[in-house]
Swiss-Prot record:
HAMAP family: ATP_synth_alpha_bact (MF_01346). The gene is atpA. It is a peripheral membrane protein. This is ATP synthase subunit alpha. It is found in: Cell membrane. The lineage of its organism: Bacteria, Bacillati, Bacillota, Clostridia, Peptostreptococcales.
Length: 505
């Protein structure tokens, strides 16, 4: 093929016209120090706070300290293959996690990656883990109940959808048990549950997954696990990741329950990270912003207004105390952020009162508005009667001469305490709770022995379901105990009591 010189020049001119000078500018930095899941990077002058940074070998980090001549970054993976002099690239993104229906029934890590061996999660939706909490206009007051299925809580410390209720107590007092029971109790409601395990043993998380699967609760639950063997930065982001997953459902008009188990370990992970980043320590060596650490997380729990879809995110944070000391730094912080707290006591737990809730110092600041009318009606005097019982029981130890009224109050208190006991993983439907509490508060069980209260309850509920199912149905459907239902309930209690006593003789 022969080309004339003028043709060659026209081809070259055409090529020059088509040439695009594409210059790709990348902001890169250099690792100057690495160790303990912390890296210091020189360069990256335009780096954002909380930005995701890419290290060699596919490891990512999060920029937390933006200093004059370097960036302090926490690593979200192993630092084994990262060395001094390595190149670090900016991604321009904040840490994000996958969200949506595909996560239901799965166990994921802090970054939303599956760790249950059930294959990849098919979703194309992602959300930033840090998000500004809904404003005042976007919210609505808490008015719908979130039933835990635990008599002591639903009757005296009611929780509403969109509330933050702290569960606080020493180790081994049944904090996680209350949280798991609450998840199991959502089986017949429309609530999606998220359980965030922070700094727990892998065996414990596996046990919880097994319990939820056995009770058919895993199908509407997501477990976000950042176990004790994981790096502090991964434990730090776990609750925010779980919250982002919950917000996706909340903003689509659904109701979500999220459990943070527990925030004491979360604060410890943040303290370790902050000290390694050379941030100045404050009280108990925690950094100055440890209050903000938890407040920005718990403020994201909300009941959205009808214009925003009316969804809700209810948070149950757990805090572990040391020898019952609730005046320590982290417990007082979280108590002041939440809308109430459920105190669990070791003394009660070891004396056989389980769940070991102390109703005297437990409180729900907004849940009363959410309690169903039937429960409000029957449980109104419960807290007062228990308080009177505790006061009288303390005096009764000293004197044997007690008048009849005092003896009656002590007997009533003993029966209430016995009735509030409940086995683990056996949450009770609210209509059954109402019927049993009605029988106790209206003094129908004064002639039943304290040890017989448990058997009486289980047989009485079976009797009501078999003979008067309409009473439970009415309470469940309307949330009220009307005149007709109350009359039927009174007659049923009297009839069953005769039958129960006859069988015992």
């Amino acid at each position: 093929m022969n080309l004339r010189p003028e043709e060659i020049s026209s081809i070259i001119q055409e090529q020059i016209k088509r040439y695009e000078n594409k210059l790709e500018v990348k902001d890169v930095g250099t690792v100057i120090q690495v160790g303990d899941a912390i890296a210091r990077i020189h360069g990256l002058e335009k780096c954002m706070a909380g930005e995701l940074l890419e290290f060699p070998g596919g490891v990512y980090g999060m920029a937390l300290n933006l200093e004059e001549d370097n960036v302090g970054c926490v690593l979200l993976g192993s630092d084994d293959k990262i060395k001094e002099g390595d190149t670090v690239k900016r991604t321009g993104r904040i840490v994000e996690v996958p969200v949506g229906e595909a996560l239901l029934g799965r166990v994921v890590n802090s970054l939303g990656q599956p760790i249950d061996g059930k294959g990849p999660i098919q979703t194309d939706k992602y959300r930033d883990i840090e998000r500004v909490a809904p404003g005042i206009i976007a919210r609505k007051s808490v008015h719908e109940p979130l039933q835990t299925g635990i008599k002591a809580i639903d009757s005296m410390i009611p929780i509403g959808r969109g509330q933050r209720e702290l569960i606080i107590g020493d180790r081994q007092t049944g904090k996680t048990a209350i949280a798991i029971d609450t998840i199991i109790n959502q089986k017949h409601s429309d609530v999606i549950c998220i359980y965030v395990a922070i700094g727990q043993k892998k065996s414990t998380v596996s046990q919880i997954q097994d319990t939820l699967e056995k009770n058919g609760a895993m199908e509407y639950t997501i477990i976000v696990a950042s176990t004790a063997s994981e790096l502090a930065p991964l434990q730090y982001i776990a609750p925010y990741a779980g919250c982002a997953m919950g917000e996706e459902f909340m903003e689509n008009g659904k109701h979500v329950l999220i459990i943070y188990d527990d925030l004491s370990k979360h604060a410890v992970a943040y303290r370790a990270m902050s000290l390694l980043l050379r941030r100045p320590p404050g009280r108990e060596a925690y950094p100055g912003d440890v209050f903000y650490l938890h407040s920005r997380l718990l403020e994201r729990a909300a009941k959205l207004s009808d214009e925003r879809g009316g969804g809700s995110l209810t948070a149950l944070p757990l805090i572990e105390t040391q020898a019952g000391d609730v005046s320590a730094y982290i417990p007082t912080n979280v108590i002041s952020i939440t809308d109430g707290q459920i105190f669990l006591e070791s003394e009660l737990f070891y004396s056989g009162v389980r769940p070991a809730v102390n109703p005297g110092i437990s409180v729900s600041r907004v849940g009363g508005n959410a309690q169903i009318k039937a429960m409000k009606k029957v449980a109104g005097t419960l807290r007062l009667e228990l308080a009177q019982y505790r006061e009288l029981a303390a005096f009764a130890q000293f004197g044997s001469e007690l008048d009849k009224e005092t003896q009656a109050r002590l007997a009533q208190g003993e029966r209430i305490i016995e009735m509030l006991k409940q086995p683990q993983f056996k949450p009770m439907p609210v209509e059954e709770q109402v019927m049993m509490i009605y029988a106790i508060t209206n003094k129908y069980l004064t002639d039943i022995e304290v040890v017989e209260i448990g058997p009486f309850e289980s047989q009485f509920i079976s009797y009501m379901v078999g003979h008067h199912a309409e009473v439970g149905q009415a309470i469940r459907d309307n949330g009220v105990l009307d005149q007709a239902s109350e009359t039927t309930l009174k007659e049923a209690i009297e009839a069953f009591k005769k039958q129960f006593k006859a069988e015992r003789e």
